[in-house]
């Protein structure tokens, strides 16, 4: 009753589809990422023409943020990297992976994608341990950088690297995403992307 507008936070494809299908006549703001298994165009196609005029989509510039990550790697001369992708049903994970693939290729960075089913540090830790062992068995050098789709994953990879005696950043660089609380107090501090969540909130409330 007496609702002026609806604000939908839709980190996953299922949530995005539900927000688009919602039968509301009030203005709706959908906070989401640009890429996913359901495209923005497909989602908007679920909204009637009349209601579409009262619908706004807002989100963080994930591509711009990833471009800064790739530029930083290029600045330090990295030519190879492991990319820890988030769960594919999350639109942020899908968008960041798409951005990473295209932008890394544009900088001629050889990229190995490590697919994770969760955002958990423990899963990234297990994957990193496996990769270190696998590269060791082959007598191959690890890529010179790790890029993670969120900071939890980056923390997991850092633990595995430390336990195998690899120094950060002397032996391998690690970059996270989201600037989670506490990562600046790690040793060494985690290099991470700081999304403008405050700006996103302001944009959504406009």
State where each predicted segment sits.
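Flexible loop/turn connectors
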Residues: 55, 129, 133-206
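Hydrophobic alpha-helical segments within soluble ligand-binding/sensing domains
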Residues: 36-83, 94, 98, 121-132, ...
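Short loop/turn motifs at secondary-structure junctions
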Residues: 2-3, 77-80, 110, 142, ...
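A short acidic, amphipathic alpha-helical/loop segment
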Residues: 15-21, 99, 156-160
């Amino acid at each position: 009753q007496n609702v002026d507008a609806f604000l939908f936070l839709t980190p996953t494809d299922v949530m995005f589809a539900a927000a688009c299908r919602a039968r509301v006549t009030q203005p709706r703001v959908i906070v989401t990422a640009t890429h996913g298994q359901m495209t923005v165009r497909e989602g908007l196609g679920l909204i009637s023409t009349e209601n579409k005029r009262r619908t706004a989509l807002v989100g963080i510039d994930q591509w711009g943020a990833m471009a800064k990550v790739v530029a930083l790697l290029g600045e330090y001369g990295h030519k190879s990297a492991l990319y820890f992708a988030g769960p594919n049903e999350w639109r942020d994970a899908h968008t960041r992976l798409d951005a990473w693939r295209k932008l890394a290729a544009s900088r001629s960075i050889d990229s190995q994608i490590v697919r994770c089913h969760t955002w958990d540090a423990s899963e990234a830790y297990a994957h990193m341990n496996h990769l270190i062992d696998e590269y060791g068995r082959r007598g191959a050098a690890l890529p010179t950088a790790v890029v993670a789709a969120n900071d939890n994953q980056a923390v997991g990879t850092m633990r595995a690297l430390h336990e195998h005696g690899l120094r950060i950043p002397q032996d391998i660089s690690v970059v996270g995403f989201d600037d989670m609380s506490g990562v600046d107090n790690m040793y060494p501090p985690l290099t991470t992307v700081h999304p403008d969540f405050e700006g996103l909130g302001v944009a959504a409330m406009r």
